[in-house]
Swiss-Prot record:
Binds 1 zinc ion. PROSITE patterns: UPF0054 (PS01306). It is an enzyme of class 3 (hydrolase). Its EC number is 3.1.-.-. It is found in: Cytoplasm. Single strand-specific metallo-endoribonuclease involved in late-stage 70S ribosome quality control and in maturation of the 3' terminus of the 16S rRNA. One of its GO terms (molecular function) is zinc ion binding. This is Endoribonuclease YbeY. HAMAP family: Endoribonucl_YbeY. Keywords: Cytoplasm, Endonuclease, Hydrolase, Metal-binding, Nuclease, Ribosome biogenesis, rRNA processing, Zinc. The lineage of its organism: Bacteria, Pseudomonadati, Pseudomonadota, Betaproteobacteria, Burkholderiales.
Length: 172
């Protein structure tokens, strides 16, 4: 789910010299109060998170990834989406910087991600990779809830990016 805070979709094509440069990622990683040191040991590290997100970027981005527990996940989902339960990933997309840099926060609720991975028979690593790619696409304006065509486009991008990263199709 994407929460747009005055955000416009990131430009996908540009005919200037900047379009020839690879998108750059300025990444911060945070941990909510509920994330114990034992849980942190099981989470992907910053370098791996960046390796998963970078192929999903079509513009430079300044992103914060925050890992949270059920309480914070529920509070955020209730406060911003009016749904009183934690969800796997929330994306907060903000207005792009003047240079077009995408700015956003990706919040992943660890207990929900772990439960889904177990229920779906997926490796936890693969599920985190999928949700980070999914969230990065949301931060750039992609949306799967506006139309079937948009959902198909976003899913196809996710499947392609994850395949390049060595992960199977998350929708099968």
């Amino acid at each position: 789910m994407t929460l747009h805070v005055g955000a416009e979709p990131a430009p996908r094509e540009d005919d200037t010299e900047d379009a020839l440069r690879e998108p750059e990622l300025d990444l911060s990683v945070q941990y909510g109060d509920e994330i114990t040191s034992d849980v942190r040991k099981t989470l992907p590290k910053r370098k791996l998170i960046a390796e998963w997100i970078e192929p999903a970027l079509f513009a430079s981005a300044q992103l914060t990834v925050r890992f949270v527990g059920e309480e914070e996940g529920r509070t955020l989902n209730a406060g911003y989406r009016h749904k009183d339960y934690p969800t796997n990933v929330l994306t907060f997309a903000y207005d792009a910087a003047p240079d077009g840099t995408v700015i956003g926060d990706l919040v992943l609720c660890c207990p929900v991600v772990e439960k889904e991975a177990h229920e779906q028979g997926k490796p936890l690593t693969a599920h985190y990779a999928h949700l980070l790619v999914h969230g990065a696409l949301h931060a750039q304006g992609y949306d799967h809830e506006t139309s079937d065509e948009d959902a198909a486009e976003m899913e196809a991008l996710e499947v392609d990016i994850l395949a390049k990263l060595g992960f199977p199709n998350p929708y099968q």
